[in-house]
Design a protein with these regions (language model features):
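Conserved ATP-binding subdomain of kinase catalytic cores across diverse folds
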Residues: 1-117, 121-122, 128-135
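C-terminal catalytic region of ATP-dependent kinase domains
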Residues: 6, 20, 43, 127-218
């Protein structure tokens, strides 16, 4: 791995690098665990494992919302390494994120499942080929309700049959898939959260007990 720069506005050490894959070089984001800033409300484990957990769950559910992610050794120790996504700079990210597209709706559902507390506009990555990915999933899976997102346009809408099937699969695969990446208490909370989503049958609404939108939203 060859580190080429650092994103100075990131709250944790976030490095731009290239990794050799066969005879090719792939651009990646590298976040060493040693560079993670301690968080009072996420005291256990590390953010890198949570990022890996979101990737594994997204792939298992067939959503493909998270770029390829692994945890591996790098120049500054063990850390998360994620494929770099070239975004389409011509797109209006606010207009896209506030729209009704199925891809954005999938992201809103996924955030409700993983209890994402940091879905900002800047954490949504649209490409010129029409794909939409999400990044920065380190603050997810908390056992307490902490959903904060800019994707509230689907609040209270009923789940489709496809979305119910996604939730049912998430409930089935998550405990085995994510064991060791998040805490046992967080795994139990994840299953309970999915059960509640299935019981309600609709997208959650903003909580009165927790800020609904991350700040700043970009």
């Amino acid at each position: 791995m060859r580190v080429e720069g650092r994103f100075v506005d990131a709250s944790n050490a976030t490095l731009f690098a290239h990794c050799a894959v066969g005879e090719e070089e792939v651009a990646v984001i590298y976040k060493p665990i040693a560079g993670e800033r301690p968080l009072w409300d996420f005291p256990d484990g590390n953010l890198a494992n949570r990022e890996l957990a979101t990737y594994l769950l997204s792939e298992s559910l067939g959503l493909h919302l998270v770029p390829f992610t692994i945890v591996r050794e790098g120049p500054f120790g063990l850390g998360m390494v994620q494929e770099w996504i070239e975004i389409d700079e011509e797109l209006d990210i606010v207009e896209l994120a506030q729209g009704p597209s199925e891809r954005v709706r999938d992201m809103a559902l996924f955030d409700a499942i993983i209890n994402n507390t940091d879905r900002k506009f800047g954490h949504i990555l649209p490409t010129s080929s029409g794909e939409i990915y999400g990044c920065d999933h380190g603050v997810t899976f908390h056992e307490a309700p902490k959903l904060r997102t800019v994707l509230w346009q689907f609040a209270s809408l009923e789940f489709s049959d496809r979305e119910i099937a996604i939730l049912e699969r998430a409930r089935m695969v998550a405990p085995g898939l994510l064991a060791g990446l998040i805490t046992p208490a967080e795994l139990l909370a994840l299953v309970a959260r999915i059960d509640d989503l299935l019981l309600q049958g609709r997208f959650p609404e903003p909580s009165e007990d927790w800020p609904a939108v991350p700040w700043p939203p970009f």
